[in-house]
Amino acid sequence: MNIFNPNHDRKAIVIFSGGQDSTTCLFQAIAEYGKENIEAITFQYGQRHAIELEKARTIAQDLGIKQTLIDTSVMKAITHNALMDEQAHIEQKENELPNTFVDGRNALFLLYAAIYAKGQGIQDIITGVCETDFSGYPDCRDVFIKSMNVTLNLAMDYPIPISKTPLMYLTKAQTWQLADELGVLDYVQKHTHTCYEGIEGGCRKCPSCILRNKGLKKYLTQKGRKNV
């Protein structure tokens, strides 16, 4: 993977949750744009666990990145899902989306990020969505991102290329590889939060933990074989 392609004449904002994917994107953005040209935007959408926001804040402070927190918790009043209901049991029924899917979340995030970017003179928006190793979320697909790009350009008359989706076609193992190539695999493993249950270090049982740990194990196995 070619990950170092300095683009220091532009500014970018990373949609940042404090999870593995968005943190990897943040590190890649720093390498590509320079830390002084990067900002992070985080959304409080009514997620069931505060640890997600705490991790995002801590990482942004640790890296010296300006972080903007936007409250979109009104979503709890108009939609229901397991990510915003502490009492809900996380599950996925056959031929249905997982009940962790938040209707309209990524569309809303991109809209607010675009509004902020235009106001700050930021050219690029980076998001860690991926359609390779994902749970079937329709708003993680490349076709959706491209559609939002067109929609926002038309709505705001501002050429924001939301096409910055560096993880779109990477497996979870390849995302770990990218973190390793950036020299931050240990940091991402130690400091990011992915667990749907909000457990520090992960519950190892929820779909998100399983995908994360399976990807890490696969990458480390492949890396070990190459080093033999």
From Swiss-Prot:
It comes from Haemophilus influenzae (strain ATCC 51907 / DSM 11121 / KW20 / Rd). One of its GO terms (biological process) is queuosine biosynthetic process. Pathway: Purine metabolism; 7-cyano-7-deazaguanine biosynthesis. This is 7-cyano-7-deazaguanine synthase. CDD domains: QueC-like. The keyword ATP-binding applies. It catalyses: 7-carboxy-7-deazaguanine + NH4(+) + ATP = 7-cyano-7-deazaguanine + ADP + phosphate + H2O + H(+). Coiled coil: none annotated. Catalyzes the ATP-dependent conversion of 7-carboxy-7-deazaguanine (CDG) to 7-cyano-7-deazaguanine (preQ(0)). Its cofactor is Zn(2+). HAMAP family: QueC. Binds 1 zinc ion per subunit. Its EC number is 6.3.4.20. Belongs to the QueC family. InterPro entries: QueC (IPR018317), Rossmann-like_a/b/a_fold (IPR014729). Pfam families: QueC. Keywords: ATP-binding, Ligase, Metal-binding, Nucleotide-binding, Queuosine biosynthesis, Zinc. ATP binds at F16, S17, G18, G19, Q20, D21, S22, T23, T24, C25, L26. SUPFAM superfamilies: Adenine nucleotide alpha hydrolases-like (SSF52402). The gene is queC. GO terms for molecular function: ATP binding; ligase activity, forming carbon-nitrogen bonds; zinc ion binding.
